[in-house]
């Protein structure tokens, strides 16, 4: 069985993430979505909330599993028996960062390959960071995230308070 890992913060999961998940799942028998804590980011949602969100949005996709991890990506990939890591690319800036990460990951474990998938052109501008910023200023995010996620983001923004109001 060929296993792949698609790691991310998914805070929140976007339509861009969903596109990469659907396409990445076609490349392997099992795609493990690794929801991570990222010390360099300030998440809007807890790991548990993000896990629930991603599990719900991927429930209808065969061969997709969603788990949390808090370790080096290559250690996580090895623990999942993964042969590949799936990464989405939106722009040249993504490539530069991901290329460097893939090189470091190869140094850590050369048995796992990194596979880059280009984002769908219509989804390239979408980033979780921008979705949160738009929502915090009261903008509509329904074109960027799954419908149920819109409700969760709006509810969280109402709880923490909008900016500029």
UniProtKB/Swiss-Prot annotation:
Its cofactor is Mg(2+). Gene3D superfamilies: HUPs. One of its GO terms (cellular component) is cytoplasm. Pathway: Cofactor biosynthesis; coenzyme A biosynthesis; CoA from (R)-pantothenate: step 4/5. It is an enzyme of class 2 (transferase). CDD domains: PPAT. It is found in: Cytoplasm. One of its GO terms (molecular function) is pantetheine-phosphate adenylyltransferase activity. GO terms for biological process: coenzyme A biosynthetic process. Substrate binds at residues 9, 41, 73, 87. It catalyses: (R)-4'-phosphopantetheine + ATP + H(+) = 3'-dephospho-CoA + diphosphate. Its main location: cytoplasm. Its EC number is 2.7.7.3. This is Phosphopantetheine adenylyltransferase. It comes from Rhizorhabdus wittichii (strain DSM 6014 / CCUG 31198 / JCM 15750 / NBRC 105917 / EY 4224 / RW1) (Sphingomonas wittichii).
């Amino acid at each position: 069985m060929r296993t792949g890992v698609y790691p991310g913060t998914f805070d929140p999961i976007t339509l861009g993430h969903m596109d990469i998940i659907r396409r990445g799942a076609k490349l392997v028998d099992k795609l493990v979505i690794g929801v991570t804590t990222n010390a360099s980011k300030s998440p809007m949602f807890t790991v548990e909330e993000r896990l629930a969100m991603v599990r719900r949005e991927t429930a209808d996709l065969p061969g997709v599993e969603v788990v949390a991890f808090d370790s080096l990506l290559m250690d996580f990939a090895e623990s999942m028996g993964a042969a590949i890591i799936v990464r989405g690319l939106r722009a040249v800036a993504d490539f530069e960062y991901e290329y460097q990460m893939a090189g470091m990951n190869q140094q850590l474990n050369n048995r796992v390959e990194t596979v880059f998938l280009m984002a769908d052109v219509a989804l390239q501008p979408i980033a979780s960071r921008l979705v949160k910023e738009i929502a915090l200023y009261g903008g509509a995010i329904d074109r960027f995230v799954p419908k149920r996620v819109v409700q969760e983001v709006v509810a969280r923004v109402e709880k923490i308070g909008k900016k500029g109001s």
